[in-house]
């Protein structure tokens, strides 16, 4: 009887695990304007042209851009979105966004939802208040955001996020994404040329990376007691802790219910956004943890890491916690690195 009972319990557990996996499979990437979403919302001919743009770097004709923008708007509104934003990465260390509603007036008291190709492809935020790395004078305000079709748009908090580059009127990079894409292009040209000389019939190479995000979690009430943490995100003074990271007993230790619940919510939010959140565990220092994704193309991995850091900090407040992403928030214990296994492949 005992053997039969154990077999039944094992089978039941496997079925429960399978059901959970199917649920994740069903909602993974549900908030991303993925290729499957494009197939549903775009005419077949336009979808094929979009694939050429994304995979081969071809230009997108204006008339096609209008169709893509309208389809993207319809998909986002079906997800409950009311606004869109050009999401970019200026030289501030964080992302930037300006939200515009889809509505356009058609009369004194009426509006229509509209989103056109020119609004998808280009935006004009005021660049005078963003750092330029000394490229130009501070009074020069002109700056442009340009759609990056290789990184998929997504919906978050009722807003359609469109990944974009940020540059000046003469093409000078005012962000972190533009140099990254240019370096990828330079590496692609050089590597393809070398491989062709060596006899390999290669037409394109891409770089991949999987940044491991380390972070600290501390109680929100304790966080509020420290002005230095509130202002700078790190401690500036204080005594050494009673116990540090001696014996490394925190590393890979069992997770508390509070932290586990936090990690589960983080996973769910990231999976909805198509982020391959894979591995999570306790790190060496007390209260330090790590979230590692499956590697993907460098450009997408960079965008997803920005999302990961944002989600880690926002979800922490739901559990009475504060997430510290500073590289060295505490003296005498490990800081938070960001290991990334960079490579390139054909």
Predicted regions and their residues:
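Extracytoplasmic/secretory-pathway proteins
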Residues: 13-14
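Flexible inter-domain linker/hinge segments
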Residues: 18, 23, 27-32, 185, ...
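Active-site core of metal-dependent hydrolases
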Residues: 10, 27-140
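A short alpha-helix capping/helix-coil boundary motif
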Residues: 26-30, 49-53, 244-247, 289-293
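Extracytoplasmic glycan-interaction modules
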Residues: 9-10, 203
